[in-house]
Amino acid sequence: MFSGSIVALITPFTPDGEVDYISLKKLVDFHVDAGTDAIVSVGTTGESATLTVEEHVKVVAKTVEFAEGRLPIIAGTGANATHEAVTFSRLLNNTGIAGYLSVTPYYNKPTQEGLFLHYNAIAQETDIPVILYNVPGRTAVDMRPETVARLSEIKNIVALKDATGDLSRVAKHREMCKEGFVLLSGDDATGLEFVKLGGQGVISVTNNIAAADMAKMMHLALDGKFDEAAIINQRLMTLHKNLFIESSPIPVKWAAHKMGLIANGDLRLPLTQLSEPARPIVAQALSEACIY
């Protein structure tokens, strides 16, 4: 279920700042048609930090509704307070999701034991599969491989999204974690190499606008056809990098609007529109990727 090309989906807004459910449905259909393997709803790229609890739950539920069982939906449920993460899990438990993606607690910098206890508490509240999410560049805490290995022994903790960009960890996680534990890259620029080293897929920002190419690349890689996959990856490499020229999801939301995938490219403060100097840089990356 959790492998291949998984999109970290953007959350579209109307000009007055409300969630744009018409564009959201269009995005879901776009990914179904492109062969995307799963959708992460309301993760970091989906601006989870600026949605209310009610909006968060509704966006996930509507994404499940729009998918109509055509691909699995994974709900972002991270929080820096364990009780809040548990509450999200409870609220989303009956929405039809296939799993939770739970980022490490941010800002308060827990110890490794604190991380273990945090995720253990979440796992005890649900039978739905939990995907760990390690992104120290955003959270200021790094979940070490030893902690991931301990957590992998918990029945419904089934996968890790590793956005460290440290490819040496693939082998460490593969060696230390229980058999069958899924490793997913959270870094587009190194995602293909991650799979080559033993990962099972990528949770991708690039996928928002290059869904068919990302799906084809990941499926080739999982079939062991790395030379063919590398050709696609090389064409997308500038895009992988330039979608982070400003804080994500600022560039990818601008690109999605430019391509007509969403009706409006606005974000919620404190995130702002892509700056004027950055726009031609992202536009050039779209051109080099041959997707617009």
Swiss-Prot record:
Q: Where in the cell is it found?
A: Cytoplasm
Q: In which pathway does it act?
A: Amino-acid biosynthesis; L-lysine biosynthesis via DAP pathway; (S)-tetrahydrodipicolinate from L-aspartate: step 3/4
Principal location class: cytoplasm
* Entry keywords, A to Z: Amino-acid biosynthesis, Cytoplasm, Diaminopimelate biosynthesis, Lyase, Lysine biosynthesis, Schiff base
> Pfam families of this UniProt entry?
DHDPS (PF00701)
User: Subunit info?
Assistant: Homotetramer; dimer of dimers.
- Which protein, by its recorded name, is this? 4-hydroxy-tetrahydrodipicolinate synthase
The species this protein was found in: Vibrio cholerae serotype O1 (strain ATCC 39315 / El Tor Inaba N16961)
Give the source lineage, highest ranks first.
Bacteria, Pseudomonadati, Pseudomonadota, Gammaproteobacteria, Vibrionales
